[in-house]
Amino acid sequence: MGITKTSVTFLFLLILAAFVSNYNVLASEIKPTGRIDDQCKQMCSATYGDGKCASDCRKAGFSSGRCLTSSPFGNKCCCTK
C-alpha cells in the first residue's frame, strides 16, 4: 500500500511540475520589433516551417525565428533579435 501511495504521489507531482513548467512557454509570444519587412521575409509553407525558419534566422544573426500567420505577418518567417 505504501509503495502504491508513494508512486501515485510521485506521478502526480511529476505531472504538476510538467504542467507548471510549460505554462510560461505557452503564454509567450514573439513580437517582432522594428520594420516587419526587415525581419519577416521568407514565406512559410508545409515544407518551410518553424524549424527551418529558426535555423535561417540564426544564420542571419538573429536569436530566433518562427512562422507567424496572423495579420500583418501573413504566414511569414519572422526573426527576433
UniProtKB/Swiss-Prot annotation:
Extent of the signal sequence: 1-27
One Pfam short name: Defensin
GO annotation, cellular component aspect: extracellular region
InterPro entries named among the record's database cross-references: Defensin-like_dom (IPR056373)
Chief localization: secreted
Disulfide bridges in this chain: 40-79, 44-67, 53-77, 57-78
Keywords assigned by UniProt, alphabetized: Antimicrobial, Disulfide bond, Fungicide, Plant defense, Secreted, Signal
One annotated GO biological process: defense response to fungus
Subcellular location: Secreted
Family as reported in the entry's similarity comment: Belongs to the DEFL family.
Protein name, entry field: Defensin-like protein 43
Organism name: Arabidopsis thaliana (Mouse-ear cress)
